Amino acid sequence: MFKEKAKDWDMNEMVKQLTSAISGCIIDNVDLKEKMHVMDFGAGTGLISSKVAPHVNKITAVDISQSMLEQLISKQELKDKVEILCQDITTQPTGDSYDLIMSAMAMHHIKDTDNMVKQFAAHLKPGAKVALADLDKEDGSFHPEGIEGVYHDGFERNEFQTILEKNGFKDINFVTALTVPKEEKLYPVFFVVATKA
């Protein structure tokens, strides 16, 4: 799905809007520090990483799309700040512990949300945070019909909160990052920050 889109991904107007809003939410709602080691899960071409990188020490960009990550490593501003991992962390953990795991619009591509959140907890230091953004529950019209790799039509916030709590997260705070207009419909995107207990 993402191989043919990788080259032009950064030019997509909706992607630009999402990047600006979600990175703004991360910067405004997470106390980013120069010593932080951050995982960008579902990093894609590194748009969110590019915005967060100046505020932290190092970013590990994780994605299963090699073509997306190739676009990421070509970015000059990320050259000395980012390492890339093309792997599925549910079956192949990174072996590191992070101060923050951030993820933008990747969770609806993950079949087992509960297990993914469990893996996030396992990869975080105690007291570290997750900062996640994805679609609020929608009617399935956001993505084209029959598209591969889309397992959820967004999420109910209370159900997502329950998954976070079940996997040891506290201080859970949701905001609306932005509302995406698409083909005469509006799709709210939530942003949630939570702390590993």
Predicted features by range, described:
Residues 39-91:
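Class I SAM-dependent methyltransferase SAM/SAH-binding core
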Residues 102:
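A conserved beta-strand element that flanks and buttresses the S-adenosyl-L-methionine
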Residues 105-106:
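Short catalytic micro-motifs in class I SAM-dependent methyltransferases
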Residues 1-32, 47-48, 71:
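Conserved class I S-adenosyl-L-methionine
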Residues 114-129:
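A short glycine-rich, Lys/Arg-flanked "PGG" loop and its adjoining helix->strand segment in the class I
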Residues 1, 10-16, 50, 131-193:
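C-terminal alpha-helical "lid/dimerization" subdomain adjacent to the S-adenosyl-L-methionine
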Residues 27, 50-53, 117, 121:
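A structural alpha-helix within SAM-dependent methyltransferase catalytic domains
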Residues 35:
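Phosphate-coordination loops involved in phosphoryl transfer and adenosine-cofactor binding
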